[in-house]
């Protein structure tokens, strides 16, 4: 059984072995030919000739993660709609109605997120009720 598999996939095995050997050769040559300058300046990050200031670990707002999630959601939507558009003739009116329902549900979800303020990246304004009385 192993002999049958080996006969059928010998070209792929040679390709994998060649790719691994090529990677090992490139890593080995980089280690042999690369510079080895060590010093205090080598341990600092390079920022286009400007001395680095502050900590590199910055806190990101949760809004950035929300934008990333929206991107993934609508990217998957585009993937499904692309697959539908390729087979639109075979799916007929039933496929069109299903795609319209899918797009409608996504639009309802988008309108809901817009309505609750999930798409607003600016901070909310303070209410005018916090004023001091004169």
UniProtKB/Swiss-Prot annotation:
Physiological role: NDH-1 shuttles electrons from NADH, via FMN and iron-sulfur (Fe-S) centers, to quinones in the respiratory chain. The immediate electron acceptor for the enzyme in this species is believed to be ubiquinone. Couples the redox reaction to proton translocation (for every two electrons transferred, four hydrogen ions are translocated across the cytoplasmic membrane), and thus conserves the redox energy in a proton gradient.
Enzyme category, top tier: translocase
Superkingdom of the organism of origin: Bacteria
Topology relative to the membrane: Multi-pass membrane protein
Keywords from the UniProt entry: Cell inner membrane, Cell membrane, Membrane, NAD, Quinone, Translocase, Transmembrane, Transmembrane helix, Transport, Ubiquinone
GO cellular component: NADH dehydrogenase complex; plasma membrane
Reactions performed catalytically: a quinone + NADH + 5 H(+)(in) = a quinol + NAD(+) + 4 H(+)(out)
Disulfide bonds: none
MF GO annotations: NADH dehydrogenase (ubiquinone) activity; NADH:ubiquinone reductase (non-electrogenic) activity; quinone binding
Record's subunit section: NDH-1 is composed of 14 different subunits. Subunits NuoA, H, J, K, L, M, N constitute the membrane sector of the complex.
Matches recorded under HAMAP family: NDH1_NuoA
Family from the record: Belongs to the complex I subunit 3 family.
Name of the molecule in the record: NADH-quinone oxidoreductase subunit A
Compartments where found: Cell inner membrane
Chain segments annotated as transmembrane: 12-32, 64-84, 93-113
E.C. no: 7.1.1.-
């Amino acid at each position: 059984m192993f002999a049958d598999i080996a006969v059928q996939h010998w070209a792929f095995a040679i390709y994998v072995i060649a790719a691994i050997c090529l990677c090992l050769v490139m890593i080995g040559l980089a280690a042999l030919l690369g510079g080895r300058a060590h010093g205090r300046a080598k341990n600092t990050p390079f920022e286009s000739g400007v001395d680095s200031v502050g900590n590199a670990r910055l806190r990101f707002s949760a809004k950035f993660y929300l934008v990333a999630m929206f991107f993934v959601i609508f990217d998957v939507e585009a993937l499904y709609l692309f697959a539908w558009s390729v087979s639109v003739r075979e799916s007929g009116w039933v496929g069109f109605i299903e795609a319209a329902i899918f797009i409608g549900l996504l639009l309802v979800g988008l309108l809901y997120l817009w309505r609750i303020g999930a798409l607003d990246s600016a901070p909310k304004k303070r209410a005018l009720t916090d004023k001091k009385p004169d």
